[in-house]
UniProtKB/Swiss-Prot annotation:
Gene3D superfamilies linked: Immunoglobulins
Role this protein plays: V region of the variable domain of T cell receptor (TR) beta chain that participates in the antigen recognition. Alpha-beta T cell receptors are antigen specific receptors which are essential to the immune response and are present on the cell surface of T lymphocytes. Recognize peptide-major histocompatibility (MH) (pMH) complexes that are displayed by antigen presenting cells (APC), a prerequisite for efficient T cell adaptive immunity against pathogens.
This protein's GO CC annotations: plasma membrane; T cell receptor complex
Annotated SMART domains: IGv
Residues covered by the Ig-like domain: 16-111
Subunit note: Alpha-beta TR is a heterodimer composed of an alpha and beta chain; disulfide-linked. The alpha-beta TR is associated with the transmembrane signaling CD3 coreceptor proteins to form the TR-CD3 (TcR or TCR). The assembly of alpha-beta TR heterodimers with CD3 occurs in the endoplasmic reticulum where a single alpha-beta TR heterodimer associates with one CD3D-CD3E heterodimer, one CD3G-CD3E heterodimer and one CD247 homodimer forming a stable octameric structure. CD3D-CD3E and CD3G-CD3E heterodimers preferentially associate with TR alpha and TR beta chains, respectively.
InterPro entries in UniProt: Ig-like_dom (IPR007110), Ig-like_dom_sf (IPR036179), Ig-like_fold (IPR013783), Ig_V-set (IPR013106), TCR_beta_variable (IPR050413)
Disulfide bond sites: C37-C108
Source organism of the structure: Homo sapiens (Human)
SUPFAM superfamilies: Immunoglobulin
Protein name, per record: T cell receptor beta variable 20-1
Length: 111
């Protein structure tokens, strides 16, 4: 089994409030996990996805703008971590074929 811990992340930048769902996931190795990030107080033009391993610093994975492809940071596997920002209030992160080394905190923020 694989444990992916997902946090509710406060907004950044202009103080956007976001909500993540689900808040935590346990899944079998090899399955995919989808995380939704919603901007609650305004339409977010930019969403940021981060991950944090235990006892390590927060790492920016990717930035996305509504209707555009995400811009991934160096070293992030874009085929493994699929980001979709289809509307101004919603972005999703799908971890494909999750394995124990993907266990992490996944956090979003909006601006």
């Amino acid at each position: 089994m694989l444990l992916l811990l997902l946090l509710l992340g406060p907004g950044s930048g202009l103080g956007a409030v976001v909500s993540q769902h689900p808040s935590r996931v346990i899944c079998k190795s090899g399955t995919s996990v989808k995380i939704e990030c919603r901007s609650l107080d305004f339409q977010a033009t930019t969403m940021f996805w981060y991950r944090q391993f235990p006892k390590q610093s927060l790492m920016l994975m990717a930035t996305s703008n509504e209707g555009s492809k995400a811009t991934y940071e160096q070293g992030v596997e874009k085929d493994k971590f699929l980001i979709n920002h289809a509307s101004l209030t919603l972005s999703t992160l799908t971890v494909t074929s999750a394995h124990p080394e993907d266990s992490s905190f996944y956090i979003c923020s909006a601006r």
